[in-house]
From Swiss-Prot:
<dbReference type="GO" id="GO:0005506">
    <property type="term" value="F:iron ion binding"/>
</dbReference>
<dbReference type="Pfam" id="PF04551">
    <property type="entry name" value="GcpE"/>
</dbReference>
<dbReference type="InterPro" id="IPR045854">
    <property type="entry name" value="NO2/SO3_Rdtase_4Fe4S_sf"/>
</dbReference>
<dbReference type="GO" id="GO:0051539">
    <property type="term" value="F:4 iron, 4 sulfur cluster binding"/>
</dbReference>
<feature type="region of interest" description="Disordered">
    <location>
        <begin position="1"/>
        <end position="24"/>
    </location>
</feature>
<feature type="binding site">
    <location>
        <position position="369"/>
    </location>
    <ligand>
        <name>[4Fe-4S] cluster</name>
    </ligand>
</feature>
<keyword id="KW-0004">4Fe-4S</keyword>
<dbReference type="GO" id="GO:0141197">
    <property type="term" value="F:4-hydroxy-3-methylbut-2-enyl-diphosphate synthase activity (flavodoxin)"/>
</dbReference>
<dbReference type="InterPro" id="IPR016425">
    <property type="entry name" value="IspG_bac"/>
</dbReference>
<feature type="binding site">
    <location>
        <position position="316"/>
    </location>
    <ligand>
        <name>[4Fe-4S] cluster</name>
    </ligand>
</feature>
<keyword id="KW-0479">Metal-binding</keyword>
<keyword id="KW-0560">Oxidoreductase</keyword>
<comment type="function">
    <text>Converts 2C-methyl-D-erythritol 2,4-cyclodiphosphate (ME-2,4cPP) into 1-hydroxy-2-methyl-2-(E)-butenyl 4-diphosphate.</text>
</comment>
<dbReference type="InterPro" id="IPR011005">
    <property type="entry name" value="Dihydropteroate_synth-like_sf"/>
</dbReference>
<dbReference type="GO" id="GO:0016114">
    <property type="term" value="P:terpenoid biosynthetic process"/>
</dbReference>
<comment type="pathway">
    <text>Isoprenoid biosynthesis; isopentenyl diphosphate biosynthesis via DXP pathway; isopentenyl diphosphate from 1-deoxy-D-xylulose 5-phosphate: step 5/6.</text>
</comment>
<comment type="similarity">
    <text>Belongs to the IspG family.</text>
</comment>
Length: 435
């Protein structure tokens, strides 16, 4: 075997191994209610209700839950007159609850009619979502699209032009397919569909600008349900324009499949600097928690280093050295405790969302990983001494023993948060120094 000298030559110095995303794709900033989207603003998390919008109380309850979970914009379906009539009442009730999250109206087929006949709805919404595939058909398309854009201009509202391959503009797709068939070098039909997605969004945006809607009032999206197609479409959309971009994998699915697919697609695009606002479109279990899509979106952004929302708890996966479940239970309990307390902590302890906690299960990686965290514990693995060293700011602080290790560590975490983020000395003072 050939020896390889991996040491840097003194005269050259050590070569830096770069980490981090590419620079953000530069887009025109759009204001949606009280939220800035694009133009270098933090990537915005949004979500969508699944209630009947005409059911005012149920919709208010779910919007409030999504907002409190961290959704910074919430989209609601406006599909009929009863829903349009309910929108201003939903806005009013949310305001009384102190929930100022911007509401986005999701319109299909008859959006022009609902917005014109219910001006209070048009005024209460912060943004209108238009689907260029079903805003109108044949000779009615331009008229109905123009009507929505003019209402947006009148009310000083933003618009998302959201193409979706499940409802793609069939006239555009047919024309592109026919042009491709006549080409001496035809491309794959799926590639034509991707091109149609990009053109649908961009041609609609161009038309909106011609009507008078400026770029700083437009956000574009082009959603598909296949990860590779989604990546390709958004890369092209970003390459051809500087409109603010809404990312999302449509019909991602249920459970782990939906989470993994969305994380893979959005993670790649975000790493390439593409995306100004994201939504994770999960299919919830019957009666499931709708706020899961918000938590997943936040975790994607936080694990990639784009934003911080809640303190992170790092925990090892466990192996044959960790037959005890103590570290798993402690990691779960600490994360649950943090999530429960975060609404109050955000105001009481500014910056606490940047806290890193480690709960490790044995001596192999436990001490090292705990040192990387702000506060960490290395619990004993199988056959190891029943003692758990705690590390604070990279230094061994003390060793916990006995049946109360979990409770003692939780108390240390609370003390650390209070003193680091509450203005007191950074090191816990209610416990003794390292033993």
């Amino acid at each position: 075997m050939t020896d390889v000298d991996l040491r840097a030559r003194p005269q050259e110095g050590m070569k830096e191994i770069p980490a981090g995303p590419k620079g953000r794709h530069q887009t025109v900033q759009v204001t949606v209610g009280n939220v800035k989207v694009g133009g270098g603003a933090p990537i915005v998390v949004q979500s969508m209700t699944n209630t009947d919008t005409a059911d005012i109380d149920s919709t208010v309850k779910q919007v409030a839950a999504l907002a409190r979970a961290g959704s910074e914009m919430v989209r609601i379906t406006v599909d009929r007159e009863e829903a349009a009539a309910a929108v201003p009442h939903i806005r009013e009730k949310l305001d009384k609850l102190g929930v100022d999250v911007p509401l986005i109206g999701d319109f299909h087929y008859i959006g022009h009619k609902l917005l014109s006949e219910y001006p209070a709805c048009a005024a209460a919404l912060a943004k209108y979502r238009i689907n260029p595939g079903n805003v109108g058909f044949k000779n009615k398309r331009d008229t109905q699209f123009t009507e929505i854009v003019e209402i947006a201009l009148k009310n000083n509202k933003a618009v998302r032009i959201g193409a979706n391959w499940g409802s793609l503009d069939q006239e555009l797709l047919t024309r592109l397919m026919e042009d491709n068939a006549k080409s001496p070098n035809p491309i794959d039909a799926r590639a034509v569909t991707r091109e149609a997605m990009v053109q649908s969004a961009l041609l609609s945006a161009q038309r909106a600008e011609e009507i008078g809607l400026p770029k700083n009032k437009m956000i574009l999206s082009a959603k598909v349900s296949n990860v590779q197609d989604l990546i390709a479409v958004y890369r092209e959309l970003a390459a051809r324009s500087d409109y603010a971009i809404h990312l999302g994998l449509t019909e991602a699915g249920m459970g782990s499949k939906g989470i993994v697919a969305s994380s893979a697609a959005l993670g790649i695009l975000l790493q390439e600097g593409i995306g100004d606002t994201i939504r994770v479109s999960l299919t919830p279990e019957p009666g499931g928690d709708r706020t899961l899509e918000v938590k997943v979106a936040q975790e994607i952004l936080q694990t990639m280093g784009f934003r911080t929302f809640v303190p992170l708890v790092a925990a090892c996966p466990g192996c044959g050295r960790t037959t005890s479940t103590v570290f798993q239970e402690l990691a779960r309990d600490i994360q649950a405790f943090i999530n429960e307390e975060m609404p109050a902590w955000r105001n009481r302890y500014p910056g606490v969302e940047q806290l890193n906690v480690a709960v490790m299960g044995c001596i192999v990686n436990g001490p090292g990983e705990s040192k990387h965290a702000d506060i960490g514990i290395s619990l004993p693995g199988t056959g190891e001494t029943p003692a758990a060293p705690v590390f604070v700011d990279g230094q061994k602080f003390r060793t916990l023993r006995g049946a109360t290790i979990a409770a003692d560590f939780k108390a240390l975490v609370i003390d650390y948060i209070e003193q680091r983020y509450g203005g007191a000395p950074a090191k816990p003072s209610t416990v003794t120094a390292a033993e």
